[in-house]
Amino acid sequence: MLLNRTSFVTLFAAGMLVSALAQAHPKLVSSTPAEGSEGAAPAKIELHFSENLVTQFSGAKLVMTAMPGMEHSPMAVKAAVSGGGDPKTMVITPASPLTAGTYKVDWRAVSSDTHPITGSVTFKVK
């Protein structure tokens, strides 16, 4: 079947719209501390994304997954989650200083396209 010019333009525009929306998903660009890093306890964890975040739909959980010399199930760590100095940053601030161990931040980021993207960042505190 041959497409007339209007049908072709409509299909082309729809394809471009879908492509543009797919590119609008936020991606984690960097984190502080960095994925897999080991160092002193951070006062805060910063996640930097490729897109502006919709803060009311974005969030994170901080979990201690291992502690030196002890076996235990992952333990939730009380922390506040807020926006950073720019709309592409999420800040996780632990309620108390982090002790030695392995930590994981499970994050959920939503940008203007409203599709949630999830991921995690793991780091160790000496």
Swiss-Prot record:
Binding site for Cu(+): M64, M67, M70, H72, M75
Residues bound to Cu(2+): H25, H115
Keyword Metal-binding: yes
Pfam families hit by this protein: CopC (PF04234)
Activity modulation notes: The redox state of copper bound to CopC may act as a switch between the possible trafficking pathways of the metal ion.
GO cellular-component term (any): plasma membrane
SUPFAM superfamilies in the cross-refs: E set domains
Phenotype upon gene inactivation: Disruption of the gene reduces copper resistance to intermediate levels.
Compartments it resides in: Periplasm
Domain of life assignment: Bacteria
BP-aspect Gene Ontology terms: copper ion transport; response to copper ion
Function: Copper-binding protein involved in copper resistance and homeostasis. Probably mediates copper resistance by sequestering the excess of copper in the periplasm. May act as a copper carrier in the oxidizing periplasmic space that exchanges either Cu(I) or Cu(II) with its putative partners CopA, CopB and CopD.
One MF term in the entry's GO annotations: copper ion binding
Protein's name in the database: Copper resistance protein C
Keywords assigned: Copper, Metal-binding, Periplasm, Plasmid, Signal
Induction (free text): By copper.
Lineage of the organism: Bacteria, Pseudomonadati, Pseudomonadota, Gammaproteobacteria, Pseudomonadales
